[in-house]
Amino acid sequence: HSFHKLYPGIVIEVLQGTYDDVVYWIKNGVVDMGFLSASSAGDLSIVPLYKDPLLCVMPQNMERHGDGEYIGIDEMKTYPFVAQRESTDADIQNFLKGSALDVHAKYHVVDDLAMVSMVAHGFGICIMPEMVMKDIPYEVKCYPIKPEAYRIVGLATQNSEFMAPAVSTMYQYIIEHYKQKDEVDV
């Protein structure tokens, strides 16, 4: 909204898709830039913007086997899981593999809202990025994960040096206004 006020002559079209969709769109010139997880960017140029913690999401009324404000891998292993399809969120899949958290989910979904709705209705727990959970309309509990798990969200382009002037203007605006104040490294 603030960009449009400063540059009313620049028309912006927003597309939503999976990480794979966004990579494909950038590489094939469908879009000029896109927001991606750094782990999904492949050979695209990416500027890290935000370190987004992963959270364990539980039904509001589920009794925990552990206690405290955090949840560990060993405790997560004791609950049923609602999982995203592998192509949906690479960071969560990488976390599961890296933590030896062998998830035998009975439910596999693509949509974030559908997954959190299933958790809210008692089908199990899930792992979601904090940014996704900020405006979720379901009553669930969210716990930070120990050891810390996160994704790095960045602004990806085919080549940040060769952009149309309007694209370059928006690219620089996003970096200047939305990059997390703390250093975010890939």
Predicted regions and their residues:
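A late-sequence structural motif
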Residues: 60, 142-184
